[in-house]
């Protein structure tokens, strides 16, 4: 069977085929019905595949070759920070004292693990300029919701129930308005100015006595630093609102600037992005939230504290928003982030930002002659191009992304942010070499030339992948999400 015709594991099944055998029974045989109630016993056997161990190994090895990850190739997905994840992280996370413990163990038996969590929170407080951090949230959007729920609790504790609106820029991550809605707020959008930054006059018009918070990413999703951030903080604070920092782009300012020093009251981080937890496959992640002093009472409980040299959880938090996750966060990702921070140190984290920004600006300048550059200025860790020039030739940004697959690259983020037509958002990260950047630049230049000379080649891409272009409308309206077993 060719790689193109890869069968489902169910289709490899043959009745009676097994992958292992059990030793002969040396204890009395007991019927399952004698142990379990009929409520828990199937009327019919589950339709599970019957395959050999070799079948399984070849099947999943073949599938793995269809995947693209940071370890297999360049992954310039904008606003996702697809950097290399050092393998020392995996080694430390697999230490039995970390990997083989359970959250229900007695605290005295896991003091080392609790110390790691406590120290990690202190490192994150220092990095962000916050006064206290919770590690409970499972990922970025979960962190957003947690931070917004704390802001809501803060206003309600003051009897300020009219603060029902959260302001977001038109360049915001899509999770920002979504998180605000789930947290019970209405969203108000403010526009960007000609420089790609928040329009201060529009912000002033939007802020009022109903404003609960302004959610902001800095640098923003255009890769541009909000230079007037202190003035923006003053506008929001004078109106009685809070300033929320979406930490998706923290990789651009590590050891260079701290959200707390810019005037932010709440910060969420993406440890799986900035601090090298493996991501891109759906989880797990880690989205810690840091707050300034006046929001500490509302942190999720329990709060990890150190008392008389011993680490313990404090449940006596009457104003806390409650738990936001069972137990204490995604521990394995936190171990990896802690390992990364300790191995890099302050100087190493500073170098991360410097190289991430350098790589992004290098690529931007190299590609600017071939694609439209909406904001022709110094960028931070990522930048956006526009495919408007190619669109006039009949080649869409989607076509460009599909054509990149033929060169072995994961495409950049496309059509986001929404305020840039035919947007192409590229984030190279700090871990890529100049040779890798140059090869990707050459591919992008070749595609731009193909759009002029042979647009059909780009329009019909990809040409070398196993799966070509799907019917995306049909996939969205009539998804096939599971295998339907045939009648036996």
Curated annotation (Swiss-Prot):
Residues found modified as N6-(pyridoxal phosphate)lysine: 273
One GO term of the biological process aspect: glycine decarboxylation via glycine cleavage system
Catalytic function, reaction form: N(6)-[(R)-lipoyl]-L-lysyl-[glycine-cleavage complex H protein] + glycine + H(+) = N(6)-[(R)-S(8)-aminomethyldihydrolipoyl]-L-lysyl-[glycine-cleavage complex H protein] + CO2
One Gene Ontology MF term: pyridoxal phosphate binding
EC number: 1.4.4.2
Keywords: Oxidoreductase, Pyridoxal phosphate
Cofactors named for this entry: pyridoxal 5'-phosphate
Pfam families given in the database record: GcvP2_C, GDC-P
GO cellular component terms listed in the entry, alphabetical order: cytosol; glycine cleavage complex
Keyword Transferase included in the entry's annotation: no
Summary of the function given for this chain in its UniProt record: The glycine cleavage system catalyzes the degradation of glycine. The P protein binds the alpha-amino group of glycine through its pyridoxal phosphate cofactor; CO(2) is released and the remaining methylamine moiety is then transferred to the lipoamide cofactor of the H protein.
Family according to the record: Belongs to the GcvP family. C-terminal subunit subfamily.
Subunit relationships: The glycine cleavage system is composed of four proteins: P, T, L and H. In this organism, the P 'protein' is a heterodimer of two subunits.
Annotated HAMAP family: GcvPB
Protein name per its UniProtKB record: Probable glycine dehydrogenase (decarboxylating) subunit 2
Native source species: Bacillus subtilis (strain 168)
Name of the gene this protein is made from: gcvPB
């Amino acid at each position: 069977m060719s790689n193109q015709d890869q069968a489902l594991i169910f289709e490899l099944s043959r009745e009676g085929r097994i992958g292992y055998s059990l030793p002969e029974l040396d204890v009395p045989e007991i019927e399952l019905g004698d142990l379990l109630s009929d409520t828990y016993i199937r009327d019919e056997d589950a339709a599970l595949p019957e395959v050999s161990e070799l079948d399984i190994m070849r099947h999943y090895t073949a599938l793995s070759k269809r995947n693209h990850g940071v370890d297999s190739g360049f992954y310039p997905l904008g606003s996702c920070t697809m950097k290399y994840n050092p393998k020392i992280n995996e080694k430390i996370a697999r230490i039995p004292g970390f990997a083989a413990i359970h959250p229900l163990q007695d605290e005295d038996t896991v003091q080392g693990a609790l110390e790691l969590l406590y120290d990690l929170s202190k490192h994150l407080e220092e990095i962000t300029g916050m006064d206290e951090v919770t590690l409970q949230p499972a990922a970025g959007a979960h962190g957003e919701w947690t931070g917004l729920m704390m802001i809501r609790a803060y206003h309600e504790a003051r009897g300020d129930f009219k603060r029902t609106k959260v302001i977001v820029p038109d360049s915001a991550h899509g999770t920002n308005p979504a998180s605000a809605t789930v947290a019970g707020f209405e969203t108000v959008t403010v526009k960007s100015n000609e420089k790609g930054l928040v329009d201060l006059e529009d912000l002033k018009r939007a802020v009022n006595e109903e404003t609960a918070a302004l959610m902001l990413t800095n640098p923003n999703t255009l890769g541009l630093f909000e230079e007037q951030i202190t003035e923006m903080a003053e506008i929001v604070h004078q109106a009685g609102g809070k300033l929320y920092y979406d930490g998706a782009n923290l990789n651009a300012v590590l050891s260079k600037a701290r959200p707390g020093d810019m005037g932010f009251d709440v910060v969420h981080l993406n440890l799986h992005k900035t601090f090298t937890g493996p991501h891109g496959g759906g989880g797990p992640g880690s989205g810690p939230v840091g707050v300034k002093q006046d929001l500490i009472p509302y942190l999720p409980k329990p709060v990890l504290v150190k008392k008389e040299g011993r680490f313990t959880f404090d449940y006596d938090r009457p104003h806390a928003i409650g738990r936001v996750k069972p137990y204490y966060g995604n521990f394995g990702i936190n171990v990896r982030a802690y390992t990364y921070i300790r191995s890099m140190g302050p100087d190493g984290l500073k170098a991360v930002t410097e190289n991430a920004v350098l790589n992004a600006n290098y690529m931007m300048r190299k590609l600017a002659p071939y694609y439209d550059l909406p904001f022709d200025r110094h960028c931070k860790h990522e930048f956006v191009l526009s495919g408007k020039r190619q669109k006039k030739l009949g080649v869409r940004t989607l076509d460009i992304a599909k054509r990149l697959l033929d060169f072995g690259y994961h495409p950049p983020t496309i059509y986001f942010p929404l305020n840039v037509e035919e947007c192409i958002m590229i984030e190279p990260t700090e871990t890529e070499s100049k040779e890798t950047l140059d090869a990707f630049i050459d591919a992008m230049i070749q595609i731009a030339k193909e759009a002029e000379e042979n647009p059909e080649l780009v329009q019909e891409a990809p040409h070398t992948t196993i799966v070509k272009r799907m019917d995306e409308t049909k996939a969205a309206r009539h998804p096939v999400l599971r295998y339907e077993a045939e009648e036996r």
